[in-house]
Structures are given as C-alpha cells and as structure tokens.
Amino acid sequence: MKLVLTQEVPGLGSPGDIVDVADGYGRNYLVPRRYAILATRGAERQVAQIKRARDARAVRDLDHAKEIAGQLSGLSVRLVSRAGKEGRLFGSVTAADVVSAVTDAGGPALDRRRVELSTPIKSLGSHTVAVHLHPEVSAKLTVQVTSA
C-alpha cells in the first residue's frame, strides 16, 4: 500500500515522503491516526508542495540559527551562586540557569535543550558552554560563575 506521510513517523519517514507499507499497518494504524494519506495524484501534488515548504523552512531555520550564533559568539554571561570555601557550588548550574542568564543579559531566547553541558557546572570560575542551534550551526558562550 502506497501512502504519503503527513507527520514524522519514527523508522518510516518524514512528512511528504511516499512510503510503501503493509496493508494492515497503513489501514489500521497510519491512516486512522492521520499519520498518512493514500497516495493519489492529488496527494502527489500535495507532496511536492510540502517538500517546497520544507525546503524553504530549512533555509529560513538555517539563516535564523546563524543570526542567533552571531549574537551568542561574543556573549559572556555571569551567574551568581552560593559556594563553599573551596569554590564548589551548593548545587549546580543547569542548562535552564544558563538560558535565563542569557535572556537576562539581553541575548536571544533559547531552548534549554539546545544548551549542552557535558557535566553540570559545580565550581566557580569561567566555563565554556556549547549551544546547538541547528544541525549545521553551533555557538559557544562563556559562563562566569561567581560566589554570592
């Protein structure tokens, strides 16, 4: 059975892909849940329209990610946290803390899932944090953790 996917289906494809699946899988799962529609001539035209829209969105997303990376490139953020005598923090600095500090410093709004901390920041000092904005674009920013 040939279907046109309308949503992302893990292991099968992305919206606009024409896939060949077993009749039962298509009829009982994909079509009723509106993950796919039957592949007809009208659906194939719709696929072409979806692909054009997806390509335009990909270009727009890449440009937006490059713009945000430019804003983050020279940004240094300062976080104040309580710490012990040896410079170890009571708790840790998380990705959400970094995002709120960037926003407070006048930087762009970020999603905390885009901020990559290899390990939580648990000490005072300067730390470099990677922000993955797009599969092709990432930026690094400096987080300065100081004692309260």
Curated annotation (Swiss-Prot):
Transmembrane segments: none annotated. Keywords: Ribonucleoprotein, Ribosomal protein, RNA-binding, rRNA-binding. GO terms for molecular function: rRNA binding; structural constituent of ribosome. SUPFAM superfamilies: L9 N-domain-like, Ribosomal protein L9 C-domain. InterPro entries: Ribosomal_bL9, Ribosomal_bL9/RNase_H1_N, Ribosomal_bL9_bac/chp, Ribosomal_bL9_C, Ribosomal_bL9_C_sf, Ribosomal_bL9_N, Ribosomal_bL9_N_sf. Gene3D superfamilies: Ribosomal protein L9, C-terminal domain (3.10.430.100), Ribosomal protein L9, N-terminal domain (3.40.5.10). PROSITE patterns: RIBOSOMAL_L9. The keyword Ion transport does not apply. It comes from the Bacteria. GO terms for biological process: translation. GO terms for cellular component: ribonucleoprotein complex; ribosome. Belongs to the bacterial ribosomal protein bL9 family. HAMAP family: Ribosomal_bL9. Binds to the 23S rRNA. This is Large ribosomal subunit protein bL9. The gene is rplI.
